[in-house]
Amino acid sequence: MALGGFDGAHIGHKILIDRAKSTGRIVGIMTISGGKSGKSLFTALERENIFRSHGIDFALELEFEEIKDMPPEEFIEFLEKECNAEIFVCGEDFRFGKGALGTPETIKALGKKVFVEKILYDGDDKVGSSLIKRCLEKGEMERANELLGFPFFLQGEVVKDRGVGAQIGFPTANIPYPEEKFPLEQGVYETRVFVDGKEYKSITNYGARPTFDNNKVVTETHLISYMGDLYGKNLQVQFIEKLRENKKFESVEKLKEQLEKDVRRVTKDD
């Protein structure tokens, strides 16, 4: 069983998962939500899809408040009973139990088999959810994706909105950004959308609509070359690169000109 926060599965987590898979046993991971880390990189549904793509057999989702006062020894015993865990895999900085007193050495002292992996660094920075969040806050999408090992994404159902995009020739799929999901830096992004098993290049505005004097933060995506109704469909929007800041244009025509430039930039290699 792989142990860690597993707010998604970044390249450091992938090392733990691969080690767990190398044992030839059923592979499970333990994830913890809540606590000091605040908002998560991914929702529970998004994490489920990530874990499935990594070949995880099951995930045990725990709330920090439920386990924070559990002594380390009791916590390991809980995992053994709950998941029939026989082999543990964790990073050398893994801490658990009341007061974060449990360490990999604690697991060994209990007579359990445990594989301990070294901390992974990107330059001078420790690879982890905190570093990825800092990248998202600054719009450094390419670095965030390198640390994740896959594109950061939003998954959800398309809802009806005012239809302003369609009125100016750029229809958009609007997906509510979950309250529990860590926010990006506001701006316009190059994205990829997967719908009905097909991939579409796209541009996504995450933020307000200043040209229309609307300060509500939205996530609206224009799928290039898509024809059809997206309302009610479940989409995955992958963020590739930040194209520009969100800004107020002096007219709708100026906004359309900029959107056309954005589309040309995204499709320049086609």
Model features per residue range: what roles?
Residues M1-N49:
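N-terminal catalytic cores of NTP/NDP-binding nucleotidyl/phosphoryl-transfer enzymes
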Residues R25-G28, D57-F58, E86, K113:
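Residues at the starts of beta-strands that form the adenosine-phosphate
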Residues S40-R47, K68-I76:
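Glycine-rich, highly charged phosphate/nucleotide-binding loops
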Residues R52-F58, G139:
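Structural recognition of alpha->loop->beta junctions
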Residues D57-I67:
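A conserved beta-strand->alpha-helix junction
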Residues A59, V114-V116, V237:
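Generic structural signal for residues in well-ordered beta-strands
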Residues M70-T172, F194-V195, E250-K254:
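Classical nucleotidyltransferase
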Residues D161-D270:
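Phosphate/ribose-recognition catalytic cores of enzymes acting on nucleotide-derived substrates
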